[in-house]
Curated annotation (Swiss-Prot):
UniProt keyword Mitochondrion, yes or no: yes
Keyword annotations from UniProtKB, A to Z: Electron transport, Membrane, Mitochondrion, NAD, Respiratory chain, Translocase, Transmembrane, Transmembrane helix, Transport, Ubiquinone
Subcellular location as annotated: Mitochondrion membrane
Protein name: NADH-ubiquinone oxidoreductase chain 4L
Amino acid sequence: MYSSIMSLVFLLPIVAVVNLISNQSHFLMTLLSLEGITLSLVLFVPISLSIMSASNVSISVILLTFGACEASLGLSLMVLMSRSYGTDMLNSLTANKC
């Protein structure tokens, strides 16, 4: 039981990082990849604490709070960028607008 869950938890951040590397052009896909990494941390911490028989589960709540803050900041930046530049493409940020 634990081996299948742990393999899924170890596989999830790898898939999210590969998605982050392969989809660097769209801001929304970058945000989704970062949320996948945060989700894997939220899943990994309680599982590892239960394996080590630790009783402190407040760390996962703190990580979940930081994940929610990250999501709200990312979406507000995406709305600001799409209103300013008209697109969510990341290469529009680096283009020279002389």
